[in-house]
């Protein structure tokens, strides 16, 4: 009996440190009791390393958050431990609760697809209209090289030869066009387009010349002979010299183009 009396009182003495530590308030003891330390060592293999308590942990994490040691499975304790951790640290998101993000390869393909596909074909910056025949559905794939026409810069020697040819032939034939293309280092298309533009310019110049020929100012200009025919003969002091009509006193014999007066005509008749 003495042995039993000595054995049973030792049990509350062993449990007293844990009970004493639990009965205290929110004060933090940097050196936890042995029972908590042993429980922490057993839970270290299953708990998250970010959640494990060590002497350098923040002071707001109290030793009462460590779940008690029991014979139940470890998984419920882990979930309970994570719950307390999220409750005291809301700024640190749990890896399981994070939103899923696409991989780098998937995001790269999406950006590439958005860059190459256009909702409307006229959004393409080009001067040609080749997309009208290529666009069959709602999506249009951009070409690698823009189909832009560049203006051909002709040299002075090329322009001189082309002008000479145009002076003789307004419409160039196919064999002559091939010869000029080889001689001037141009394509047949360049020569054909140049002759088309040159003919349009020549027609405009011809229209301007015809317009000048039918100008009313030029129609009013008549020759001196027409003026002499239309002008009535003046009696007395009128003298006609070319296009100018000059007024003069009585005619004298020194003037070659003398208009005789009425008195002189009567004297001539009497004689």
From Swiss-Prot:
A GO MF label: RNA polymerase II cis-regulatory region sequence-specific DNA binding
GO biological process: positive regulation of transcription by RNA polymerase II; regulation of transcription by RNA polymerase II; type B pancreatic cell differentiation
Tissue/organ expression: In embryos, expressed in the anteroposterior band of the endoderm, with expression continuing in cells of the pancreatic anlagen and duodenum.
Composition bias, Polar residues: 249-261
GO-annotated cellular components: nucleus
Location relative to the cell: Nucleus
Pfam family of the protein (one): Homeodomain
Protein family: Belongs to the Antp homeobox family. IPF1/XlHbox-8 subfamily.
Name recorded for this polypeptide: Pancreas/duodenum homeobox protein 1
Organism field: Xenopus laevis
Upper taxonomic lineage: Eukaryota, Metazoa, Chordata, Craniata, Vertebrata
